[in-house]
Amino acid sequence: CYKKLSMSKKNSSVILKNGFKDFPDLNKIYLNFKNKIIQTRIKSFIVAISGGPDSLALAALTKALKSEKKYNFQYVLINHNIRKNSSFEAKQVKKLLKVNNINLKVLHNKIKIKNNLQSHARNLRYDLLVKYCLKKNTKSILTAHNLEDQVETFLIRLSRGSGLTGLSAMKFETKLNSKIKL
């Protein structure tokens, strides 16, 4: 469900607390999300949280679904320790989710990233998430992306000279290894 939403952290916080009743358009997105999750036939997920509005909306979606069905969602934030405020920001996100009865596990990247920051950070993030999945015996990771993320992925691939097969945007499901799906 890559519908463009005007979602601020404030709106995400309201949704976490009250559900979707104050945002009628989000009910359609929730039902679409719920159907996609049901179709996977998977009951346990790691939910990757960044603290941005997309991932807070995902936290709200999973919290609502958990209250309705028997799913196990474990919430994880990767702190890359890149910025001075990274630890403070991670604590703030953890606090926000805790107030909304969501437990957040913060994993810390200890490898210093020297170049190609975005790509290396993404690879390290997925490595940490895969290790956490294996530790928790969970085979699926949920991440939040919006339409702008899809367009950005397409444009990055285009700028790198990708051929027709590489010009797709993000897939709904990607295998990270033989056991773990994103």
Stretches with model-predicted labels:
Residues 1-6:
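Short, Lys/Arg-enriched N-terminal segments with co-localized hydrophobic residues
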